Amino acid sequence: MTTIHTLGYPRIGAQRELKFALESFWKGASTEADLRDTGRALRERHWNAQRDAGLDFVTVGDFAWYDQVLQTAALLGALPTRYGFDPAQLTLAQSFVLARGNADHAAMEMTKWFDTNYHYLVPELTPDLRFGPGTGWLFDEVREAQAAGHRVKVALLGPVTFLHLAKARGGLADKLSLLPQLLPAYAAVLKRLAAEGVEWVQIDEPALVLDLPQAWSDAYGPAYATLAAAGGPRLLLATYFEAASHHAALIRSLPVAGVHLDLVRAPQQLEAFAPWPADKVLSAGVVDGRNIWRTDLEQALARVAPLAQTLGERLWLAPSCSLLHVPVDLAAETRLDDELKGWLAFARQKLDELAVLKRAVIDGRDAAHAALAGSAAAIASRAASRRVHNDSVKKRAAAIRAQDAERAAPYPVRAAAQQARLNLPLLPTTTIGSFPQTAEIRQARAQYKRGELQALTYLERMRAEIADVVQRQEALGLDMLVHGEAERNDMVEYFGELLWGYAFTANGWVQSYGSRCVKPPVIYGDVYRPEPMTVEWSRYAQSLTAKPMKGMLTGPVTMLQWSFVRDDQPREQTALQIALALRDEVRDLEAAGIAAIQIDEPAFREGLPLRAGDVAVYLEWAARVFRVSASGVRNDTQIHTHMCYSEFNDILPAIASMDADVITIETSRSNMELLDAFGEFAYPNEIGPGVYDIHSPRVPRVEEMEALLDKAAQVVPVQRLWVNPDCGLKTRGWPEVEAALRGMVEATRRLRARHAGAVHAGTPATRAEHAESALA
């Protein structure tokens, strides 16, 4: 009989119960007992949902108070030694110190989980780290599920992936050298799970989809031989997010009882495993765990029916990956219309899709006729819908020419035209875009959205805020101003609500990290701009000052990356449609007299594919759609972009090919070390390295910012340097913002005084230098 299961389930709750319980506990408004009660209730509800849908196991081990990688580290005793915590006695409060930091300890580093929008806490490996024993939370949850009558399958992050995701610290030369010490801790966990009556452990090794160095792939055989000898439950090796076919021979050889493959992202990979090993279960990931569209059940059944005939009971069906990455339950959704809702499936609905496939496989198509027909009708409705397909948008995208993705002149020519228009001083000062959003601003936006505030009153309040922001910037002495973005709740949602082809849920929340949840927009159809989105705000702001005002837009790749994207056309095509909508906005801003336009791309690097062989294609189209959005303007209109990453080296050629006149980047926390890559690459255009960290309420001393600017001037010619904070200032308070910016302007004045003979890029004295630099 075919088995159905899920690799994981969202932990936050359909109404974000975990988020609110965590934040209440952190504020001291509730007790640890209250928090634990919420966790217990959520686990019970989620296990019951799996049972009620007909899954053969409930998955235990996917719940975490903050992050599953942190919880794995705690289980294995692999906590950073700098905290001095005893893993076996770890309290919830201590676990939150690891995750969030406190006055005595910086938090653990956090980074993206593969190519998703979830963030995990990075384990720290030091020479003095000793593994196991750790917390007993996992075993408590196993007993909790068993006591409720559930058949348990445990999900556990595998040892090689755990080490691969970690960072070496404290002089540790080789993370992999710790594997022999780590394996006994895993073996002990597996033995204890067997003693608790657990039959199967899903051991996640998503690192197997990556291009691993030989030493890392070679580590799998001995590691799993050790685990197989531990006398634990049967192991289901889980891979996801990409094909593992390049490691097919290795995976076939491992002493595990089953393997999970992502057949949504990489359906073709099954061929590399043919014939399927006779000693292994195949867990076929045929329901998309990362997107919200209904599964084409007819198509999925056509894929799994032959597998069922060949494998019989050795065929399991599952989502492609954990359902952590999709909202909990479509039944809780109130904002979407019935047609659009009918095209979607959240986590709870995806469990039902698995049950339909199981019924059709075991009892035949007729037994699942109604559900299959409903799926087919939804797929057909979406394919034929006029709200999805817009011929004029498709024709415009198809007509894009190479010259539409190129500025009219090279950077040195543009720099001269822009400087003639803008007359900027050496080391121009600016900010990244947003300014503090007070409770009054947020309240006005919310009242306007609910219809409680008339349009004219709302306009007056926003204009008053813009006028205040402009006046404050002028008083501080900034050189290029922004309007402050008071009208925007979110840099993607604001634009999505003004574009056709986008929809927004009321309750489509997913976990980003800890208690932070995001509600990604839904791109369901061809994207176009019915009318200008930002022009009137920027035009009004520019009317208040003689200084140049930057228009502020979110770039096409970021609009794509931070959304649930339609799956019926290539992502590149959707990105191009967004770029064309932004191109129209850019041209309208220019026509309104806006001389500088910033197109933010904080998610440009996040879109990188997991496999090295796919990276060049992505970078080519990602840079091209940016240029499409930016290239319809005159030479004297200055295009800015902003990015914030911890690593630039591998994408610098692509960033250069975006051909923005000015790029601002986040560098203060790295003490300007990130800027070194731009210097070594000889980045040809202008750069604004962030001189202070906006994520901290601390106001840096003038001397600190001056020292950072000095370091920057040693890497990038001072004529091409801008001065700015790391990121937008939306989440900060006005007193700290004004103090920090005042210090930033003073640090800039001091540096200008030491470079009195220099002038900003594009002025006649420096044109030759820039032409030479651009050709270097």
UniProtKB/Swiss-Prot annotation:
Coiled-coil annotated residue ranges, if any: none
Binding residues for 5-methyltetrahydropteroyltri-L-glutamate: R16, E17, L18, K19, K112, R516, C517, W562, E606
Binding site for L-homocysteine: I432, G433, S434, E485, D600
One Pfam family, short name: Meth_synt_2
Active site (record annotation): H695 (proton donor)
Top-rank taxon: Bacteria
Cofactor: how and how many bound: Binds 1 zinc ion per subunit.
Keyword Metal-binding: yes
Regions of compositional bias (Basic and acidic residues) in chain numbering: 767-776
Region of interest (Disordered), residue spans: 755-776
EC number: 2.1.1.14
Keyword terms, alphabetized: Amino-acid biosynthesis, Metal-binding, Methionine biosynthesis, Methyltransferase, Plasmid, Repeat, Transferase, Zinc
Residues that, per the record, bind Zn(2+): H642, C644, E666, C727
Residue numbers binding L-methionine: I432, G433, S434, E485, D600
Alphabetized GO MF terms: 5-methyltetrahydropteroyltriglutamate-homocysteine S-methyltransferase activity; zinc ion binding
Database matches in PANTHER family: 5-METHYLTETRAHYDROPTEROYLTRIGLUTAMATE--HOMOCYSTEINE METHYLTRANSFERASE
NCBIfam families: met_syn_B12ind, PRK05222.1
HAMAP family membership: Meth_synth
Protein function: Catalyzes the transfer of a methyl group from 5-methyltetrahydrofolate to homocysteine resulting in methionine formation.
Name of this chain's protein: 5-methyltetrahydropteroyltriglutamate--homocysteine methyltransferase
Species: Ralstonia nicotianae (strain ATCC BAA-1114 / GMI1000)
